[in-house]
């Protein structure tokens, strides 16, 4: 397994061990017992972390949220990076981490259907795992993401991947945020939040601590961003007081999408500060210019070759229409 850098765009590509993956996926599909349910701990790799009572043992029932290594990891925790070149091309070993967050011991498919207290525990697990992985100096970025719908295992789970390089999309956000800060000495995300709250027309949801918006330049139909109202560059700095508000925001937005779009497949991704290094010139203003957030993207339409080839997105909806529809969709829990 290797990481290869595109010398033109700077994008990194992971060459995974694809030969193993179809067999593993097929075995999971054909399994009579869900490996993520409570009581099936022996069917997964040994747990890395779990929220569980102090008197319970690892890899045993009784847990609330459980984290295990991926069955088919994109990156492997063992080894050194061994950065090297093949003439003009850069590559390194595919060293990183790839973890599965099993969000509940009960056989529930969608995060939106979990109780608020359980979603709060899931988010707490994200925070603890991100903070722990950032202690490893080999890793530059830690990404939390979820793909709902079409999963091999129909049991609510998400994933965490730690990479030894900063993903290209995140680097573009960091550079754009830094440029804006250089001009105005303000966080661009804080300015977006201020304007969206003033105009209201793209606001989907808000509470004391968090704001959900249909972004002005939405790439996908019903795309929603979830941001902390208070400036914060790193996700793992969330306080205990803010956790319940984030759980409510997550559940409300996901339930609205579930109801309006008839339980669509969706993805969400955490965008947060990379693992900072004490290095001259290395994003010295990031604590002031960047703002962590989640991007939630229902898969309402398929991307076309034009979009893949150009970076232009064809979106048949406007964020103003989307926000109006989602605001009007009443949910109770």
Region locations from a protein language model:
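HIT superfamily nucleotide-processing domains
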Residues: 1-333
């Amino acid at each position: 397994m290797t990481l290869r850098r595109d010398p033109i765009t700077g994008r990194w590509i992971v060459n995974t061990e694809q030969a193993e993956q179809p067999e593993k996926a097929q075995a999971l599909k054909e399994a009579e017992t869900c490996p993520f349910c409570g009581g099936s701990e022996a069917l997964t790799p040994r747990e890395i972390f779990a929220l569980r009572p102090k008197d319970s043992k690892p890899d045993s029932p009784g847990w609330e949220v459980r984290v295990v290594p991926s069955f088919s990891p994109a990156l492997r925790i063992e080894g050194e990076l061994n950065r090297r070149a093949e003439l003009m091309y850069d590559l390194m070993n595919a060293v990183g981490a790839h973890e599965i967050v099993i969000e509940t011991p009960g056989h529930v498919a969608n995060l939106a259907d979990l109780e608020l207290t359980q979603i709060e525990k899931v988010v707490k697990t994200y925070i603890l795992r991100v903070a722990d992985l950032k202690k490893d100096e080999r890793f530059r970025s830690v990404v939390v993401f979820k793909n709902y719908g079409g999963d091999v295992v129909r049991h609510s789970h998400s994933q965490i991947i730690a990479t030894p390089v900063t993903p290209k999309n995140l680097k573009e956000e960091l550079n754009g945020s830094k440029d804006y800060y250089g001009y105005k000495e303000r966080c661009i995300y804080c300015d977006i939040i201020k304007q969206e709250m003033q105009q209201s027309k793209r606001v989907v949801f808000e509470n004391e601590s968090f704001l959900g918006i249909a972004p002005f330049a939405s790439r996908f139909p019903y795309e929603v961003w979830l941001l902390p109202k208070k400036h914060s560059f790193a996700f793992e700095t969330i306080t205990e007081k803010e956790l319940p508000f984030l759980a409510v925001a997550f559940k409300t937005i996901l339930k609205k999408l579930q109801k309006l779009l008839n339980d669509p497949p969706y993805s969400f991704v955490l965008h947060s500060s990379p693992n900072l290094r004490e290095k001259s010139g290395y994003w010295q203003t990031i604590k002031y210019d960047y703002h962590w957030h989640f991007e939630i993207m229902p898969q309402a339409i398929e991307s076309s070759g034009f979009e893949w080839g150009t970076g232009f997105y064809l979106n048949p909806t406007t964020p103003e229409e989307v926000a109006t529809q989602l605001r009007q969709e009443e949910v109770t829990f």
